[in-house]
Amino acid sequence: MWVALILSFAMQGLHGADPAARTIAQDDMSAIDEPRQVVARTRTDWESLWRAHGSNQPAPKVDFSTESVVAIFLGSRPTPGYSAHFLRAGLKDKVLTLEWAERRPEADSIRAQVMTSPALFAVIPKFDGEIKFQKVSP
């Protein structure tokens, strides 16, 4: 299965329209306000992560027999307009590396002065090996 995963990532990237990495939730106000990247491979881990995130919505459904959840928490930001997105993935020495970037608001844009804690949740095809997150410049 991981060969198909890597080929899919390499050919299409990890954008929201890519079926290999499906965004299941995105939020500007996570209760997790420290930068963190997380993999949830079980329903128990996912429910615990979702509770820590602090959403008042039910956790999105995930089929853990075929999928894993990957999440990025940016930590506290001074204004709205920040978000994370996946760029691509690569497999080397049995380690799956997920490259991601942070989007920032335009420097000259007018924004509310309110603290945010952006979070991104996506599902990827199940991968039992080590998963690393690598932040890159867009």
Please name every model-derived segment:
Residues M1-L7:
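Sec-dependent signal peptide recognition
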Residues F9-P138:
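Exposed, flexible binding/inhibitory loops of compact, secreted disulfide-stabilized domains
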